[in-house]
Design a protein with these regions (language model features):
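N- and C-terminal low-complexity/disordered segments
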Residues: 1-116
Length: 116
């Protein structure tokens, strides 16, 4: 019985990560905020999302700005961005999810929702 307890204790300390338990940092694969929504990469991805949505939905939205964003490391990077876009009138907010693998020059619009 003592050996079983020792094994469980060893396994616990092997997998235990104090910073995750205390809520510090982010878990691998978790979403983290984009620190600068004016970063050229984030803006490029947001414009790509609007352009792809326009092609798929036969729409004519015009990109205005990125309001906020999150990113997630996957096989590449997922970007979840809130975008302001206008369609002839006042700008409205939309939420887009874009999967990016820059080393393959690959980008895919996964979803585009809104106005939200």
């Amino acid at each position: 019985m003592k050996n079983l307890f020792t094994i469980i204790l060893i396994i616990f300390f092997f997998f235990y990560k104090p910073s995750a338990a205390l809520g510090e940092g982010t878990l691998s694969g978790g979403w983290k905020p984009v620190p600068d929504v004016t970063d050229p990469t984030v803006v490029y991805i947001a414009k790509f999302a609007v352009d792809e949505h326009n092609k798929e939905a036969h729409a004519s939205l015009k990109f205005v700005k990125v309001v906020k964003g999150e990113c997630q490391v996957v096989a590449g990077m997922n970007y979840n961005v809130t975008i302001t876009a206008a369609d002839g009138g006042a700008g409205k907010n939309y939420v887009a999810l874009v999967w990016n693998k820059p080393w393959e020059k690959f980008m895919q619009l996964v979803s585009f929702k809104g106005p939200v």
